[in-house]
């Protein structure tokens, strides 16, 4: 194989390897624990944080969303979040878990990101918000920086579908259909 062919092949395969996440269908997400900040808790109008780990992703069907702490990342899969809100999924059997990587935020914006999460927690108290100040999930799951990943988990916490990056309208529909199937 000539050097030119090897170089061309490398250029073609490199983007696929760079965006390869660590989620395997039928398996649990690779284990992580977030001790700096962690899960945002709302109790009697008071916010606090508690340690969170991925072993807690059992018991409900869920969409696990990992997003960089920047508006551009949040917007990548806003269509899916709107579809989930519109579907009015049963809170006793479904939960959205959002992990926000504030380590991947525009410098100085972390306070604003946390304020936005607090507002969302008040609006959607049944949803779970995790603040990852050190980028633990990003590294362990090999996700793209400045992006948004979506993982659908069954009630046993096993991956049913995953993508790192913006979802197409067809993929949003595929996720919604899968959620309805898993909730039956």
Curated annotation (Swiss-Prot):
Give the principal location in a single coarse category. Answer: periplasm
Question: Which Gene Ontology cellular component terms are annotated?
Answer: periplasmic space
Q: Where is the signal peptide?
A: 1-20
Record keywords, A-Z: Periplasm, Signal
Give the UniProt subcellular location, in the record's own words.
Periplasm
Q: Report the superkingdom from the record.
A: Bacteria
Cross-referenced Pfam families, in alphabetical order? YtfJ_HI0045
Database matches in InterPro entries = YtfJ_HI0045
Similarity remark:
To H.influenzae HI_0045.
Give the protein name, as stated in the record.
Uncharacterized protein YtfJ
Gene name for this UniProt entry: ytfJ
């Amino acid at each position: 194989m000539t050097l030119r062919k090897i170089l061309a092949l490398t250029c073609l395969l490199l983007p696929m390897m760079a965006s390869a996440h660590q989620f395997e269908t039928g398996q649990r997400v690779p284990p992580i624990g977030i001790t700096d900040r962690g899960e945002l808790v709302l109790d009697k109008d008071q916010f606090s944080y508690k340690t969170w780990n991925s072993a807690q992703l059992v018991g409900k069907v869920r969409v696990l969303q990992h997003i960089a702490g920047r508006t551009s990342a949040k917007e990548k899969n806003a269509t899916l979040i709107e579809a989930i809100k519109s579907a009015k999924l049963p809170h006793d059997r479904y939960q959205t878990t959002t992990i926000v990587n504030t380590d991947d935020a525009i410098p100085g914006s972390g306070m604003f990101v946390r304020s936005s999460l607090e507002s969302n927690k008040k609006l959607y108290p049944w949803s779970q918000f995790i603040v990852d100040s050190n980028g633990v999930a990003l590294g362990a799951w090999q996700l793209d920086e400045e992006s948004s990943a979506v993982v659908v988990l069954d009630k046993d916490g096993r991956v049913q579908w995953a993508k790192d990056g913006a979802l197409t309208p067809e993929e949003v529909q595929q996720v919604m259909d899968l959620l309805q199937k898993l909730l039956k």
